[in-house]
Swiss-Prot record:
SUPFAM superfamilies: Ribosomal protein L4 (SSF52166). Keywords: Ribonucleoprotein, Ribosomal protein, RNA-binding, rRNA-binding. InterPro entries: Ribosomal_uL4 (IPR002136), Ribosomal_uL4_dom_sf (IPR023574), Ribosomal_uL4_euk/arc_CS (IPR013000), Ribosomal_uL4_euk/arch (IPR045240), Ribosomall_uL4-arc (IPR019970). It comes from Nanoarchaeum equitans (strain Kin4-M). Part of the 50S ribosomal subunit. This is Large ribosomal subunit protein uL4. Coiled coil: none annotated. One of the primary rRNA binding proteins, this protein initially binds near the 5'-end of the 23S rRNA. It is important during the early stages of 50S assembly. It makes multiple contacts with different domains of the 23S rRNA in the assembled 50S subunit and ribosome. PANTHER family: 60S RIBOSOMAL PROTEIN L4.
């Protein structure tokens, strides 16, 4: 499949053939599995204290005796804490068990649980190829919410030469992505408790820019535009190509990065 090739002035200078990675069958199930695996690698372990709900001085004899026993009292044989007493007469309540007030939880989350999900190497590569193939389907790109009416992905020659945020914005405007930029610049304040849990604002995902080599100035310039991401072509993953496990992200890739995909046979 051929797509238009643009220069830094957003003028079409020819066509370019997409590498075989873009011809993969789109597997939504594999993409989701790879995405969830990446998300699990970021999950922080959590759990209750091992002694939570077990710190009361509560004990009841299970034998037939006269002192502190539950036999012959018409009460269940559970651990009990004495709140007050008069001789051998106790006012005591159940403690240290799941059904009791101030008791432990029956099956609390364990801090030692391993949340890390593994995925086969070939399966991960298949997911990346599937996500790349989805970027050339205009219907999937529009279904993600991107506003574009030209063939995708967008291939730009010399993309690595840009250094300033203003230059990147001008290129995107010349490529006809003015409405797309307006969409990602609109940031909404989240409804609900997420506001006080470190995710107060909802940020839309815009285009993904893929380059051949790392350049600090270029990467910082892209970071200044909300919703945009940038990555080197060997470091691509499903989370970047299909945020939320939904494939079809708008892809802007440099010509050199496309040739690197072809020559190095990445993700095969």
């Amino acid at each position: 499949m051929e797509v238009p090739l643009y220069n830094l002035q957003a003028s079409q200078v020819g066509n370019i053939e997409l590498p075989p990675q873009f011809n993969e069958k789109i597997r939504f199930d594999v993409i989701k599995r790879a995405f969830l695996a990446i998300q699990s690698h970021k999950r922080q372990p959590y759990g209750a204290s091992p002694i939570a709900g077990k710190q009361h001085s509560a004990w009841t004899s299970k034998r037939r005796r006269s002192w502190r026993t539950s036999y012959g009292r018409g009460i269940s044989r559970v651990s009990r804490a004495i709140l007050r007493r008069h001789g051998a007469l106790f006012y005591w309540v159940a403690r240290n068990i799941a059904q009791a007030v101030k008791g432990k939880k029956a099956h609390p989350p364990k801090a030692e649980k391993d949340w890390y999900e593994k995925i086969n190497k070939k399966e991960r590569r298949l997911a990346i190829r599937s996500a790349l193939a989805a970027t050339k389907e205009l219907d999937l790109v529009k279904a993600r919410g991107h506003i574009i009416d030209k063939p995708v992905p967008i291939v730009v020659d010399g993309l690595e030469q840009l250094r300033k945020t203003k230059e990147i914005q001008q290129l995107l405007l010349k490529l006809g992505l003015e409405k797309e930029l307006e969409r990602v610049y609109e940031i909404k304040r989240r409804a609900g408790k997420g506001k006080r849990r470190g995710r107060a604002y909802i940020e839309r995902k815009g285009p993904l820019i893929v380059v051949n080599d790392y350049n600090e100035q270029l990467f910082k310039a892209v970071d200044n535009i909300p919703g945009l991401d940038i990555e080197e072509v060997p470091n691509l993953n499903v989370e970047l190509l299909a945020p939320g496990a939904k494939p079809g992200r708008l892809l802007i890739i440099s010509k050199d990065a496309l040739e690197t995909l072809r020559e190095r046979k990445l993700f095969f």
